[in-house]
């Protein structure tokens, strides 16, 4: 009797920290810092679906040459796609009302009332905002589709940048540009859609 009980218990202990979301796995706890570009995918899934905004800071570099232009471009792209942040999301991402109202008109560099600490928050918010274009079920199906070198990033002072393609159902959906940070973990320098979001079939 005791032996028969031990087996089910052992199998339960071996279940990873993922749950089914329409049949697809999404992390239920914050992933460990990414040791390689592919490790960022779980962070993206977790941030997009679980909305644990603290994880955004784990996967984003903090250098000015990333956060200033990155925040501007991410929010401009999200605006064009019609993706917005709710007041609750903005607050969770550390944006006060005045800052949240500026997301669609950010400068690409530091100005008097927009310093690097502000740009870091805006950049984190931009990452999450871009991810909102994908449904929870689609995130569950999202897979790694290859990694290539991004030589063009060098002209902006970013060395060693990699491009990770991700997608689902055989369709490449996004390119996630990333770089190894001083901590040894990988962080995201930019995200772009490789498909017309309005034409992307999602459940």
Language-model-detected regions and their locations in the chain:
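Bacterial N-terminal signal peptides that target proteins for export
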Residues: 1-9
